[in-house]
């Protein structure tokens, strides 16, 4: 009795019963895995913004995260991507990034900060920065807590934006779109942990 109690679990069972239990566990895993995957996909589909469903057919949910800076909660971010998306070539794929803000920000401040972050990935001339900043201020509204801003990256075309589900404009400049979405998706981002969370599971 003492030896049996100390033995690893299952070692005292007859071989035929052990085999039967292993088969049952395997069958259970095969049944549960597709179910769990289906539930996860259904939950993701249920929260898919209508503008994403319309603008990016077959969008696949990727990652989500919350940005905190010095303890302050800034926004929640969610990313959807087109089939075949690759992290290292994010600028070649369609993607939708949603930011649900947790604090208030002026449109001018968002635009100015965006230029600062975009400069981490490329040199931007003062004239180009001024033009893009003006374009962003034209498109972006002032933000209140719980407001939702969503951007769609259109490779080779530019970027379109929605505010609380309503279209607010687009910036038809592929270079702008690449650098703007690079704020979150480029290896040069100032928030590598956020990038990793958004791109979790993405092919490289």
Give residue ranges: language-model regions.
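N-terminal secretory signal peptides that target proteins for export/translocation
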Residues: 1-21
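Bacterial N-terminal signal peptides
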Residues: 21-34
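Intrinsic low-complexity/disordered segments
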Residues: 3, 15, 28, 38-40
